Amino acid sequence: MGSISSTPSQKSPVFPARSLLPSDIVAVRPEGDEAKVLKFPDLVKSIPFPLRLNPYIRFVSAESDAFIIEYANFSEKQRNRFIGLNAGLLCGMCYAECGPEQLRVCCDFMSFLFNLDDWSDEFDTAGTKGLEEAVMNTLYHPDTYVSDTVAARTARSWWTRMLKTVGPRCRQRFVETLGFYFKAILQQAADRSSKTIPDLETYISLRRDTSGCKTGFALIEYAAGIDLPNEVVDHPIIQSLLDATNDCVSWANDILSYNREQSRGDTHNLVPVIMQTVGIDRQAAIDYAGDLCNKSVAHFLEGKAALPSWGKEVDVQVEQYVQGLEDWIIANAEWSFMTERYFGKDGPKIRKGLQVSLLPVVGFD
């Protein structure tokens, strides 16, 4: 296999926290029964993109679930949680036009990424570092590196299949951005150990990597069978589209997963970061985060309208890439109420009512 170089991550600028604060947010609200209910903004309403679904998803998702269950050696509780996750459905909506082979790789990776997220939540810094070494060595040295860890064996399976058709530049971006993800969750683990809540600007930069979205966006190229030139992906407008998509997905996730995460005492979430940085209560912070989601959609539309031309052939590929980003935005917003990850089986009901009762703090399960 060819070598893969590593380059440092370029951080996108983020705006001062208080400059983003909507003028109508109330800084302090009275405590009482109202404080025990979390009200969500309608995140889907501001997204102008149609929801699409890959026609192969039903059987591909079933095959992928069986593969992960076989490799992961779940307990019964973990198995039920994994099935309720329904990661395959998210893939079917994010990668709506690819063939079954590419969709299977995407499904396997998406389920793998969600498991990494859960495993890293349970690890300290040393455990997370060991996880990183096993996975990244598998990607850098697929022909020679050997590890019996579940993470490495699972990664080797989908990676060897992906290598059959992935373009060299897309491959580079995939590996590089997964490396960014691991570096970021190491920082997240360190913050958890020290009980540190970062300020808003620091968190936004970190969250763009802990989300795993950057690697998911590389899969857009793989799924479409394209390999965009580096100068296209590195263009400021394309980067602005990537950041806007990442922010929209990450912040929607933070809003809708906040109740579950606060019940575990997990503070790597936009809501507590806003509460601390801006000095407002949890409901005001949720409203604030919803406003940021709406702004990220607006920024995406502005960037799309300003795209330059790179010539007919590349422009067609860019159009496919941007379509994939749009699919990611709407798919994540809708899927969040279809999965059992955040609301159990109550997702459809909460999708209509847009509110939940505040859960008690019980710690990590």
Swiss-Prot record:
GO molecular function list: metal ion binding; terpene synthase activity
Q: Catalytic activity annotated for this protein?
A: (2E,6E)-farnesyl diphosphate = delta-cadinene + diphosphate
Q: Where does Mg(2+) 1 bind?
A: 117
The site (Plays a critical role in the stabilization of intermediate cation) lies at 114
UniProt GO BP: isoprenoid biosynthetic process
- Could you tell me the keywords of this UniProt record? Lyase, Magnesium, Metal-binding
Gene3D superfamilies given in the database record: Farnesyl Diphosphate Synthase
Q: Where is this motif: DDXXD motif?
A: 117-121
Q: Which Pfam families match?
A: Terpene_syn_C_2
| Binding-site residues, (2E,6E)-farnesyl diphosphate | 341-342
Instruction: Tell me the residue numbers annotated for binding Mg(2+) 3.
Output: 253, 257, 261
The record lists the membrane-crossing segments as: none
Q: Where Mg(2+) 2 is bound, by residue?
A: 117
State its cofactor.
Mg(2+)
Motif NSE/DTE motif, residue numbers: 253-261
Kind of enzyme, top EC level?
Answer: lyase
Disulphide linkage map: none
Family per record:
Belongs to the terpene synthase family.
Q: What PANTHER family is this protein classified in?
A: BETA-PINACENE SYNTHASE-RELATED, TERPENE SYNTHASE
UniProt free text on domains = The conserved DDXXD and NSE/DTE motifs are important for the catalytic activity, presumably through binding to Mg(2+).
Known function: Terpene cyclase that catalyzes the cyclization of farnesyl diphosphate (FPP) to various sesquiterpenes, including beta-elemene gamma-cadinene, delta-cadinene, and alpha-cadinene.
Protein name stated in the entry: Sesquiterpene synthase 3
